[in-house]
Amino acid sequence: MSEPIVLGIESTCDETAAAVVQGRTLISNVVASSMDEHARYGGVIPEIASRAHAEAFVPCVSKALADANMTLSDVDAIAVSAGPGLAGCLAVGVSGAKSLAWAANKPIYGINHVIGHIAVTQLQFGPFPKDTLALIVSGGHTSLLHVEDVARHIDVVGTTLDDAAGECFDKVARLLGFPYPGGPHIDRHAQLGNPHAIKVPQGLTQGKAGQQHPYDFSFSGVKTAVARWIEQQQAEGNEIPIDDVCASLADSVATVLARKAMRGCEQYGSKTLIVGGGFSANSQLRAKLLEVGAKHGVEVRIPQIKLCTDNGAMVAMLGVNLVESGVKPSEPDFAIDSAMPLTKISM
């Protein structure tokens, strides 16, 4: 069988994206973001995001095909994010993808957006070794997964019990007065600060809680501790050392993620850790994981920044895996699932 060509379409949140992947080669990748429209509200407004998807869908898909010098007739299948995500946003992408699949008589795969973050690393690093672990870190998810077969079988090793890592950063960013999205601002300030200036807790790493939840994550306590420290400093009339706050927060979160990921690798005998999701663009986390991975003899695969955030390439790459593995395409009338479980790879 020749290398399958898949058109991937993404619309789970505030990015409308389309890409064409052939085998393990990225042919085209187009992203249109509505982030600027949400910035003044301090977060994503679902109705605005849905309308932006409707406006950007056709231009994105058209450009992705044009950049690949292809038409719909050239692709072997269409893959689209069916969940998890914002229901209205998912509906736009899925309905558009279904229309294309029907018009061109192509098979369609409604895929799990989060698992796409795992699959996309194949574009940069190639196939997954046996017993690969994946750390997914984003605004909505912080999970450790065992990848037995990215097209057929994934197990959840650990997940967040409250706030995800990206969510924690966004909330602290608001306290510091940073505009949305706050994560990149914390990242930049953290590079200038002292990571040991402020004592920030490391949730679920010690005592009974750490033993009961060795691979789970909790960042609500981190957010609360930093918030209280800031409030105390303000009450005492002290100037907030923003760089140090950001550095201490980033170091605490990165340390927890790296420690639990390495513990998982040891448990499963994995020598490869895949990292994905928008938060994996954080420079402190990338450095910490590479450092700890080298000490433990674990190859850490973190994709380039443009493949960390939401994109169509990740959707198309997972679609390629599904086609190659002979997974049955989704039914034409499959539904979106805004709370799609991580163990469900496709509809």
UniProtKB/Swiss-Prot annotation:
Protein name: tRNA N6-adenosine threonylcarbamoyltransferase
Catalytic activity: L-threonylcarbamoyladenylate + adenosine(37) in tRNA = N(6)-L-threonylcarbamoyladenosine(37) in tRNA + AMP + H(+)
Pfam families xrefs: TsaD (PF00814)
A cellular component annotation (GO) from this entry: cytoplasm
Primary localization: cytoplasm
Residues noted as binding Fe cation in the record, renumbered to the chain: H113, H117, D310
CC cofactor note: Binds 1 Fe(2+) ion per subunit.
Function: Required for the formation of a threonylcarbamoyl group on adenosine at position 37 (t(6)A37) in tRNAs that read codons beginning with adenine. Is involved in the transfer of the threonylcarbamoyl moiety of threonylcarbamoyl-AMP (TC-AMP) to the N6 group of A37, together with TsaE and TsaB. TsaD likely plays a direct catalytic role in this reaction.
EC number: 2.3.1.234
InterPro entries documented for this protein: ATPase_NBD, Gcp-like_dom, KAE1/TsaD, TsaD
GO MF, any single term: N(6)-L-threonylcarbamoyladenine synthase activity
GO biological process, one term: tRNA threonylcarbamoyladenosine modification
Alphabetically ordered keywords of this record: Acyltransferase, Cytoplasm, Iron, Metal-binding, Transferase, tRNA processing
Highest taxon in the source lineage: Bacteria
